[in-house]
Each structure stands twice: as structure tokens, then as C-alpha cells.
Amino acid sequence: MDPLERLYLDAMMEDPEVPARSLRPQLLAGARARRRPAAPTAAWAEPYAGRVAAMDALLTSAVDDDWSRVIVEGWTLQELVAHLAAKDGLLAASVGAPVLGPPMGATDSLGRTSDVQAYERTRSPEQTRRDWRAQADALCRHLADLPPTTPATLDGMEVPVRDHLLARCLETWIHTADAARTARLRLPDPVAEHIHPTADLCARLLPWTMLLSGMDGSGRTLHLTLTGAGGGEWQVPLGVEDTRPGTPDAHITADVVAFCFLLGGRGEPAEFPAELAGDLPLARDVLTSAPALSGP
């Protein structure tokens, strides 16, 4: 079975209704038996492990021409996978997990990416894929014994490891979609149980994206409604030092997947499809600043 077919079968899990006499349970069982599963890890780390498995299924289907095709940031598919391995390795180093690839020199994302990409250019794409997956799996296994509140530092930012891992989940998801789009393939969305915590991270980042964009949201509150599987509602205090939300000043309603991708730097804020209410300039500022933390 083609790895992309396995992805589509996994996506069927999002629909709990199984028609009578459906062959879907047998198809899913067969697909799981033949695909490489997500690495065993803590429940809170499963969204990341799931995106790694999805990316690996996509990469398994790549042929020689795919690996040399430019995907994003001027990087080929092989260089993109090396970038993911570099950032996963930095997080692994922060929590004491094994670090694969070249010896650790630079400890920032851009520097480590450059080092790992240079190293992987001397190797085959399949070696790059295997080592990226091995790095991700080693991180997952290590996290199985850690509480989600364990402090971790990446690019000078110390937050609970769960938040860093959700950020890794979002980036892996987005870059898998980048690669699938370049190959003209439709990538199924993650299951709702994996989308929701990722969306929660995106909602909690909004005060920081506003601050980085030079906008002061102190004392103001956003009511955010994200629709679709994995969505929900959030009352978001828009000042980084605000401790609790107040009465909502602005309201934004948008698709949950599109919103996550906007935070990840995909899509133009000015053209983002959303319903706005209340303080419209504030709502527009939230959307304009949303991609501020995105990067390669």
C-alpha cells in the first residue's frame, strides 16, 4: 500500500460513524499493520508523534526528483527534513534526550539548521530521512518519562516542554503540508484530539505575537472561536502580563486549521477568512500580528 493511501486511511479515523457492513475497520487494521507507527510517548506528546509519522509516510513515497525539488525557504525536500531534524535535536538537547547528526556546535535554530543541512548534503536523502525519524523517535521516547511542565529552552525561550513540543508539532504539520502541496497531494488533517492542543498553543501565543509586532494589547481581551474538528472557544487576554481575561473587546471566528496555519506563517492576514465583531481595529491587529513568531 502506498504511504499516502495509509495517510488517507488514518484520516478516516476522524469520523466516528461506521456504516453497517463497512469495510473501513478492516482497511484501517491493515493500514496500521503495514505503516510505521508513531513512536511510543506520553499522551501530551502524541500530537507531535502523530505529525512525525505522517511526514514519514509522505517521505517514504518520495522519489529521486522529489528530494531535489525546492519546497520552501529555498530548501529542497532533503534540506527541509534536515531543518526539522536540527530543531528537534535542539529540543532534545534541552531535555537531555539523545542528539543525532553532526556534533553540536551552534545552539540556535538557524545555526544548527545550517550545520545539519551541510552535513546531510553529503549523504543520501534516505539517510537524511532515517536520521530525522530516529531523532524524532528518540525525543518521543525520552519524553515518555517527563512531566509536560518540565522547563525546556529553545532559541533562548524557556517554557514548559509541552509548549515547545506543540510548536514542533505545528511546524512539522506545516512543512508536511508544504511538501504535499508541492507534490500536488492533499494531506488529511490530524485527528481532532491532536488539533485542539495545537490550536490552544496558537491562542496562547497571541499576546506575544502582538508584542513582537509592536502592538499593545494590555488590558484587552479577545473572544476567539475556532470552528471545525479540534476547535473550541478561548477568552484570550492580549497583554503578556495580563493574568486573566476580562470582558471581550473583540471577537474572531475562523476555521481552526486555517488559524493554526496563519500562526505558522501560511496565508496573508489581510486576506484571512474570518468573522470579526466588537473592536474591529483590535481584531484586525490580532490577525495582522498572528504570524510574527513564524519562521524557517
Predicted regions and their residues:
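Active-site-proximal cofactor/substrate-binding loop regions of enzyme domains
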Residues: 51-53, 57, 65, 72-92, ...
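Structural signal for well-ordered, non-membrane alpha-helices
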Residues: 56, 88-92, 136-140, 144, ...
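Active-site-adjacent bridging/hinge elements
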Residues: 4-5, 55-62, 148
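Structured surface interface patches that mediate subunit assembly and partner/cofactor docking
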Residues: 1-44, 67-74, 95-108, 121, ...
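Acidic/histidine-rich alpha-helical segments that form the ligand environment
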Residues: 51, 55, 113-149, 165-168, ...
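Long amphipathic N-terminal alpha/beta scaffold segment
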Residues: 36-59
